Amino acid sequence: MPKSKTTKLITILGPTASGKTALSLKLAKKFSAEIISADSRAIYKELDIGSAKPTKDVTSYKLQVTSKKRKDYFVNGIPHHLIDVVPPNKTLTLAQYKKLALAQIHVIARRDKVPFLVGGTALYIYSIIDNWLIPEVPPDKKLRAKLEKQPSEKLFKMLIKKDPQAKELVDSKNKRRIIRALEVIAATGKPFSQQRTKGEPLFDTLILGIKKSPEETKKAIAKRTKQMLKAGLIAEVKNLLKKGYSPKSPALSGIHYKEIIDYLNKKTSLSETVTLINKNDEQLVRRQMAWFKKDKRIKWVKNQREAERLASLFIK
């Protein structure tokens, strides 16, 4: 896909619970933008509360139906894309995400709107802004079933043995990502780390980053966990399990869902579950920041005013 000289892309990134949604909404309204989600949990249908998806039930935002055939998210009047893409038991590969996101960016630009890429999933973000050339390897169900039986620690050791550089790309705690990396290696016969070469940049991109201090992050995470539980997180998980979705499905294996499943199976008390969710979110923040800190292109902003100034200069 050729680079567009006129297409400008604003990326707003940051770790979980940093305030990306609030900032992106304010900027999007000011600059007539549409938001493309770069969140590996928001892609799943029926995962609303635990994914921190900006829906009415959790955050008092609006979900409007724009046609009988298609549902679009309108959060405070701002269109959101790549939310509710696949069911909980399906996988969206990075190559598939990139294809969908690029299509949305070009559609938004053709409407003379500014595309915003917003989220904390680094793989999604950098596949777009750095135009990663990703091999389109289809899922291998037999291999996945075999690998799924092994603990994450063992799988990660297998991955690093095959590709030492993969430790810089794959989260050692994310079993789903580890299995995907091993799957790609098995299909291509090449190291996973060598299969994400950068192509020619497709867009003129401004990267804005938002983060909180460790103390603020801890408080924000604890507050959000309480809000999720109050909004019905436990009932949401019960409903998903009742519908027949496996606890090992791609969606339910993530933070907020796996802890609640353990609670429902009486492996932990409610207070232990809350503590574990907060701890896992705090660890996620550290892993996300370890990645983002390496990118010197990110302009870290302290407030909305600073972000507006940078965005205004960029769009001009």
Question: What annotation goes with each model-predicted range?
Answer:
Residues M1-K316:
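Phosphate/pyrophosphate-binding catalytic cores of soluble transferases and nucleic-acid-acting enzymes
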